[in-house]
């Protein structure tokens, strides 16, 4: 029987087909990867939900696919008709399955043991569109007693660190992962012995032997069959693959290669069956840097930028090398990419917030009564949301073609949070529809999650504009880097009391420094000046937000 295999739920957005891993006539197993999709956030391999033979392929390299699009047509194995045909052709064979059929009967008495019935598989929950994440900490071990919602492991993706809690109380029987492993949604974390879960567990062992026995028997020969063909691949280990369609690498390796601007077909594979590992990419980058260095002062890197000479700092004194967290590494790569791709200009201005501050202080008691702390941030969020609707170019992104603007009808604003592991930017959605107290509560909650590694990847996506405030630390101004594909970011520094001429005398006024960095391809200087001028007017008299 033929079935159409479609793209499963891949989170928000769509992905480009960068690699086809099968061809018509290939025999595939359940969960075997069919193709690799690359979105603007990650690359992911799409597995086959069933075993069978590839009849035809509906997608090709370069296609853009989304959830529900056709991948291929699969001739599914193991249907009822082939079983009947075997029964007619060889009467002796059906006796074997029948002989196996009573086997589950004794096994039905075995699951009655409460120990086996109470074991649950604890798996990685939905971690959003991040796809994969590295295990950076395992907090339990076999034999430990855990409570519901107690943290089991800490995962770190390219967007955030998060702790995965236990969904139930129980005793850890075995831990299936270790520090350094890369896991995704649905991967097994550990086995947990839970009391009172026997009925649900009994049904699974009873049904599993009958269903799993045949596929298990089929999968092993199938996996063994292609092994000799692929066994030729490790032989030339160290030789780069020149055929881009046959590069074998996981999503994390592809992401690392993109960050470094490395063409995977040029990388020497050292992994099993010719698979490219992270270490292979790192070695390749080091070789290129050494080659550029030995090429003399005129040598340049892959992007045409002369590399910074390598310096042995230890000859000047004692040094210590401290590893950057993955979050810091990815953040640095993203900032570098934005800086190289976006023509930055920064507009500086000041806003008189004397009256606004008086209003904020006057509402302090009301805010505390509502259980929130009213800071300057919610007022900035509200004012910026007003301006994003008034000046829609600031609420847009440059189309990939570079010939159009994509204007957004929603107003989601990110705000930078300083954490021990690096800078995180949670996003508040529909800022224009929320009150100051609602914004204050949501900002406090997101900032707390960011600092405690509870922030999901989805909570940091979809922003139209970003606010980065250093006012609590100090400074008179800075040049924030635009978080592309956004086109602007507002930097806020420390407010100070300054003398301001009112036409008759100098008056003490509380002045807030503003730094608006913008993408000059989308925003011109006059528009940026209008933005900061209007923002100053709104902050000077926040009653104008009601107009």
Curated annotation (Swiss-Prot):
Limits of the Peripheral subunit-binding (PSBD) domain: 248-285
GO BP annotations, alphabetical order: pyruvate decarboxylation to acetyl-CoA
GO cellular component: cytoplasm; pyruvate dehydrogenase complex
Domain named Lipoyl-binding: residues: 2-75, 119-193
Molecular function terms, GO-annotated: acetyltransferase activity; dihydrolipoyllysine-residue acetyltransferase activity; lipoic acid binding
Cofactor: how and how many bound: Binds 2 lipoyl cofactors covalently.
PROSITE patterns: BIOTINYL_LIPOYL, LIPOYL, PSBD
Catalytic residues of the enzyme: 520
Keywords recorded for this protein, A-Z: Acyltransferase, Lipoyl, Repeat, Transferase
Phenotype of gene-disrupted mutants: Disruption inactivates the pyruvate dehydrogenase complex and causes an increase in pyruvate concentration and acidity of the culture medium.
Entry's EC annotation: 2.3.1.12
Region (Disordered): 75-117, 202-248
Modification N6-lipoyllysine, positions: 41, 159
Reactions listed under catalytic activity: N(6)-[(R)-dihydrolipoyl]-L-lysyl-[protein] + acetyl-CoA = N(6)-[(R)-S(8)-acetyldihydrolipoyl]-L-lysyl-[protein] + CoA
Domain of life: Bacteria
Cofactor(s) in the UniProt record: (R)-lipoate
Induction: Induced by glucose.
Assembly and interaction partners: Forms a 24-polypeptide structural core with octahedral symmetry.
Functional description taken from the UniProt entry: The pyruvate dehydrogenase complex catalyzes the overall conversion of pyruvate to acetyl-CoA and CO(2). It contains multiple copies of three enzymatic components: pyruvate dehydrogenase (E1), dihydrolipoamide acetyltransferase (E2) and lipoamide dehydrogenase (E3).
Family recorded in the similarity comment: Belongs to the 2-oxoacid dehydrogenase family.
UniProt name for this protein: Dihydrolipoyllysine-residue acetyltransferase component of pyruvate dehydrogenase complex
Species of origin: Pseudomonas aeruginosa (strain ATCC 15692 / DSM 22644 / CIP 104116 / JCM 14847 / LMG 12228 / 1C / PRS 101 / PAO1)
Taxonomic path: Bacteria, Pseudomonadati, Pseudomonadota, Gammaproteobacteria, Pseudomonadales
């Amino acid at each position: 029987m033929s079935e159409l295999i479609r793209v499963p739920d891949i989170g928000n957005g769509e992905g480009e087909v960068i690699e086809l891993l099968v061809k018509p006539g290939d025999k595939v197993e359940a969960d075997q990867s069919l193709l690799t999709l690359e979105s603007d956030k990650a690359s992911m391999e799409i597995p086959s939900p069933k075993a069978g033979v590839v009849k035809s392929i509906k997608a090709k390299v370069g296609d853009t696919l989304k959830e529900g699009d056709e991948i291929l047509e699969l001739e599914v194995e193991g249907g009822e008709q082939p079983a009947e045909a075997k029964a007619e052709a060889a009467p002796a064979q059906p006796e074997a399955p029948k002989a196996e059929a009573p086997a589950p009967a004794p096994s039905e008495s075995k699951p009655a043991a409460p120990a086996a019935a109470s074991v649950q598989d604890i798996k990685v929950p939905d971690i959003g569109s991040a796809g994969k994440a590295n295990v950076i900490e395992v907090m339990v071990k076999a034999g430990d007693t855990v409570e519901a919602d107690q943290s089991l492991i800490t995962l770190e993706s390219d967007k955030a660190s998060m702790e995965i809690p236990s969904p139930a109380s129980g005793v850890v029987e075995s831990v299936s992962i270790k520090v350094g492993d890369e896991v995704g949604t649905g991967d097994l974390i550990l086995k947990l012995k839970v009391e009172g879960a026997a009925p649900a567990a009994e049904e699974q062992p009873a049904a599993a032997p009958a269903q799993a026995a045949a596929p298990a028997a089929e999968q092993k020969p199938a996996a063994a069959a292609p092994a000799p063909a692929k066994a030729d691949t490790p032989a030339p280990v160290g030789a780069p693959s020149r055929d881009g369609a046959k590069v074998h690498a996981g999503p994390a390796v592809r992401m690392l290669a993109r960050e470094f601007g490395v063409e995977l077909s040029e990388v020497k594979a050292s992994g099993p069956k010719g698979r490219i590992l992270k270490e292979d990419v790192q070695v390749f980058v080091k070789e290129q840097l050494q080659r550029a260095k030995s090429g003399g002062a005129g040598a340049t890197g892959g992007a045409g930028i002369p590399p910074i000479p390598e310096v042995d700092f230890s000859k000047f004194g004692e040094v210590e090398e401290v590893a950057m967290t993955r979050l810091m590494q990815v953040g640095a790569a993203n900032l570098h990419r934005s800086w190289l791709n976006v023509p930055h200009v920064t507009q500086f201005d000041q806003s008189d917030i004397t009256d606004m501050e008086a209003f904020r202080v006057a509402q302090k008691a009301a805010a505390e009564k509502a259980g929130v702390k009213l800071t300057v941030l919610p007022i900035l969020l509200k004012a910026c949301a007003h301006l994003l609707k008034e000046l829609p170019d600031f609420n847009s992104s440059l189309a990939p073609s570079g010939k159009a603007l994509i204007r957004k009808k929603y107003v989601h604003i990110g705000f930078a949070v300083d954490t021990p592991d690096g800078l995180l930017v949670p996003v508040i959605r529909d800022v224009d529809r929320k009150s100051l107290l609602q914004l204050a509560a949501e900002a406090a909650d997101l900032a707390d999650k960011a600092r405690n590694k509870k922030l999901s990847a989805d909570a940091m996506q979809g922003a139209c504009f970003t606010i980065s405030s250093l006012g609590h630390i100090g400074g008179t101004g800075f040049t924030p880097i635009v978080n592309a594909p956004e086109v602007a970011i507002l930097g806020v520094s420390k407010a100070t009391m300054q003398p301001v001429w009112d036409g008759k005398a100098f008056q003490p006024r509380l002045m807030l420094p503003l730094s608006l960095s913008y993408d000059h391809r989308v925003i011109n200087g006059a528009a940026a000046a209008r933005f900061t001028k209007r923002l100053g007017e709104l902050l000077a008299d926040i009653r104008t937000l009601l107009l």
